Regions:
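Membrane-interface helix-loop junctions in multi-pass transport and translocation proteins
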Residues: 31-39, 144-149, 160-192
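Short membrane-interface helical motifs at transmembrane helix boundaries
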Residues: 28-31, 94-113
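Interhelical loop/hinge segments that connect adjacent transmembrane helices in multipass membrane
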Residues: 1-4, 116, 172-182, 192-235, ...
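Signature of the first transmembrane helix
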Residues: 3-62, 100, 127, 163, ...
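Interfacial transmembrane-helix starts/ends
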Residues: 5, 43, 75-89, 218, ...
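Helix-loop junctions and terminal segments of transmembrane helices
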Residues: 57-72, 143, 257, 262-299
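Alpha-helical transmembrane segments of multi-pass membrane proteins
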Residues: 51, 97, 112-134, 184, ...
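Membrane-interface junctions at transmembrane-helix termini in multi-pass inner-membrane proteins
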Residues: 5, 130-153
Length: 300
């Protein structure tokens, strides 16, 4: 069994198991243990973090997959990956400055329909940053064709931690407010685990490395931000917009419907985790026959 078939099957199983946990959370635990208001708030925060993620990552997760095959020596590969750890700071730092200086204005604007959002607005850039760097570290392992553990963290572990937290609300170990704050801890822990996995596979180097393709990398990442932001908005902008026009409880109802519809995309989502880096490598090496074969195999 080839690496595509093997990891696609593993990722598909992981994704379906993760969706099973997600179904229990979305259809039962959120609605019964957390309540409509805080379920809607949670969906708003996670959707907003998902919208910010491409900006916070500055397209680095896709840039890593595209450009990694171009570096031939182990030193160059390690240097490139280390460089990409700091590359997103080009956009992160200006964004954080804007959040700092215009915090009150932005928070008041976003919470005009649902005042509850104001007290939790500080979580948005943090969640976006954590989600962004999770994807950077996930891309780090994908280019080494080891996508399964990252899929486990993303699809199963996060949902299990949320499930445990929701049950803690039910037995009064946590309040609903504490649960919402705990989202930062859950996504922070997931990002740290992904970082450990990435560094276990290939350690960063303590040396400044500026790739000669810097200009091309910068331009590509800028375009990826546009496409990535559009893709993220198509997935998450609806829940964000609902919170701006109607009561936040409606975000909870809508999230249940969206989750049910998302099950259809599971096989494609799982296969993409391994086919994306393989496609990038074949294109970088001009292996068009192998690329043609890969397209045929994955379209079946």
């Amino acid at each position: 069994m080839g690496i595509v078939s093997k990891q696609s099957i593993q990722n598909t199983l992981i994704t379906y198991v993760g969706f099973s946990f997600g179904a229990v959370n979305a259809l039962f635990l959120y609605t019964h243990f957390l309540g409509e208001t805080y379920y809607g708030l949670t969906a708003f925060l996670l959707s907003s973090g998902g919208i910010l993620m491409p900006l916070m990552a500055f397209g680095a997760h896709n840039t890593i997959i595209k450009y990694f095959p171009l570096f031939k020596t182990e030193q160059e590969k390690s240097g490139f990956l280390t460089f990409m750890l700091f590359f997103p700071l080009i956009l992160i730092l200006p964004l954080l400055v804007l959040f700092f200086f215009f915090y009150t204005d932005i928070a008041l604007y976003l919470s005009r329909e649902n005042p509850i959002i104001y007290d939790f607005f500080w979580m948005l850039p943090i969640l976006g940053l954590l989600m962004g760097y999770f994807e950077v570290f996930y891309a780090w392992v994908k280019v080494h064709f080891q996508s399964v553990f990252g899929g486990f963290i993303k699809e199963i572990l996060i949902r299990v931690m949320i499930m445990i937290s929701l049950y803690s609300v039910h037995i009064h170990w946590l309040t609903s407010v504490q649960f919402v704050f705990l989202l930062v801890v859950i996504y922070g822990l997931s990002t740290v685990l992904m970082m450990i996995s990435a560094f276990w596979i290939r350690k960063p180097i303590a040396k400044i490395f500026i790739p000669k393709e810097f200009k091309a990398i910068f331009v590509y990442s800028a375009f990826i931000i546009l496409s990535g932001s559009v893709a993220a908005m198509l997935i998450d902008i609806d829940r964000f917009m609902i919170s701006q026009f109607v009561k936040i409880e409606n975000v909870a109802y809508y999230s249940v419907a969206v989750f049910i519809a998302a099950v259809v995309a599971v096989p494609s989502r799982a296969m993409h985790q391994i086919t994306h880096p393989i496609t990038a490598r074949l294109m970088a090496n001009n292996q068009h026959d192998e690329l043609n074969m890969l397209y045929k195999q994955t379209s079946i």
